[in-house]
Amino acid sequence: MQPSFWHDKWDAQQVGFHLSAVNPLLVKYWPQLELDANAQVFVPLCGKSLDMCFLAEQGHEVLGCELNELAVQQFYRENELAFDISTLAEHQRFHTEQVTIYQGDIFSLDAAEMPNTQAFYDRAALIAWPEEMRSAYARQLAKLVPANSTGLLITLDYPQAELNGPPFAVSDDWVQANLATDFEIERLSSEDVLSENPRFVNKQVSWLTESVYKLIRKG
């Protein structure tokens, strides 16, 4: 999957992955991370997600990373947030009070550029990668977040042969096999959500499960 895939999606505004409200699973499970209100939270592949606004409203400093510049511009514009732009290594840095977004490739982001991160939130990043690229993303996430940082991960799982991603199917077995080296893993919930997702119903996908995990970066 090339960067042009996502740029084309944003250019055409084919952004069905963008939610028009804060993710209810974030609202429900974020308190279980028991973070300090002022903890810095990293949001990989953040798009223009309203979840960043929710995190900022909890008192957190939010640090996102997003490949597409239009998505970043739309986040600030649609939320009526004034911002300034600077350059940091290979990324453009968009900044307003409490929300900073590095625009560019997450694989060229360096942990030195986000030294104060204490937590992370992944709703749409892990499931955005096809299986052949997913492990590389997981390794990069582990490099970026420091030891003992706590995260919330949301995944979808379904029979991949029945529908082309993204979002791609990520099973509990995959999570355990590929993240356990770097993270302590606790599954907080796993629910059947097929009836709530018309795209999957219309494509006659036989089942769809959404899971929530609490992750802690190992030392």
Swiss-Prot record:
The gene is tpm. The keyword Methyltransferase applies. Disulfide bonds: none annotated. It is found in: Cytoplasm. S-adenosyl-L-methionine binds at W10, L45, E66, R123. PANTHER family: THIOPURINE S-METHYLTRANSFERASE. The lineage of its organism: Bacteria, Pseudomonadati, Pseudomonadota, Gammaproteobacteria, Alteromonadales. It is an enzyme of class 2 (transferase). This is Thiopurine S-methyltransferase. GO terms for cellular component: cytoplasm. Keywords: Cytoplasm, Methyltransferase, S-adenosyl-L-methionine, Transferase.
